[in-house]
Amino acid sequence: MNKRYIVICILFFGVALGIYFYRNSSTSSIVPVVTSENSPWTLIATGDIIPARSVNYKTITYKDFTWAWKNIASILESGDITVINLESPLLSNCPITNDGFIFCGDKRHIEGLVYAGVDVATLANNHIGNYGKKGIDETVKFLRSRGIDVTGIDEEPAIRVVNKIRAGFLAYNDIGAKEEGVSWADTSVMEREIQELRNKVDVLVVSMSWGEEYTATPSARQKELAHFIIDSGADFILGNHPHWIQPVEVYQGKYIVYAHGNTIFDQMWSEETKKGVIGKYTFSGMRLINVEFIPTYIEDYGQPKVLEQF
C-alpha cells in the first residue's frame, strides 16, 4: 500500500515538534466533572513523572511534597482531565538514595499529585513494578484513596466524564520484561481491550511506554504499534519513556504524541533529558480542535520550570 509522507514542523509555545502526516488509501470508578454541556474541554498530559532517587531525596530534605510541582501546578490544574505517566511506585517504606535503577518514592508524594490536580495516573511502564506486585498494589491504594484513577494495571481502564463526554484511558508497557499486574503491549490483548472500551466511551486515549531511550525519532516498532492502536479504535495516543521529546504524527486523522520528554526526574546530565513538554489538548465534544505544547526545563534535580521557548 502506497503512502505519501509529509513532514510539517509547527511551533507551539516556541517548541518545534515534527508532525508527520500519513495519507492512507484505506472498570474503574467513573468520576463526573461538572461543566456546561457545549463548552470545550481540555486534556492535559505530562512527560515522565519519576519521584524517585534525587527527586525523592530533595523533596524529603525540603520537607515539601509539592516542591517538584510548584512551577507547573497551575497549568495542570487548569485541565478538565489531567493525566500523568507515574514511573515509580509510591511506598510506605521507600529507601532514600540518589542513584540506582530501582525506583520508588515516598507515599507522601501523593500530596504533590493532589496539589497539581492530577486525575489519572497511567502505571504501565518499566519501573512501576520495581518493588513487585506488593509495591504496585500499595501505589494503587494510595492513588485511589485520594481520588486519582489508575490505568495500565491488571488490564483496567479509567473513565472520566466531562461535558457529558466519556473519556476512556488505557495504558500499556512495551519496555523490558512482562511483570505481574502491569498491562503489557500484547497486540491481541490490546485490540480486544480497545474494542471493548470503544463501546463504552466517546473519546478513547491510549498511553504507551515505548521506544528507545535518548532518541529524538520514534522507532519502527513505535510507529507499527501506534498505527495498530489507531486502527483498533483509539482516538489519541500519549507516549513516553524515551526521556527525550519525540515528534507528533497524525495518522488517519488521529494524533500520536510519541514522547513528551521528562517532566519530573533527576536526569540533569544532558540538555535533552532536562526538557519536556506539557501537552494541552482541547476538545469540542468528541473532536480534538487544538493542540498546544508548553515547554518545561528541569532544575535542581527534579523541579521543572515553564519556558517560553527552548
Language-model features, listed with the residues they occupy:
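Short, Lys/Arg-rich N-terminal segment immediately upstream of the first membrane anchor
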Residues: 1-2
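Acidic, metal/ion-coordinating pockets
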Residues: 5-310
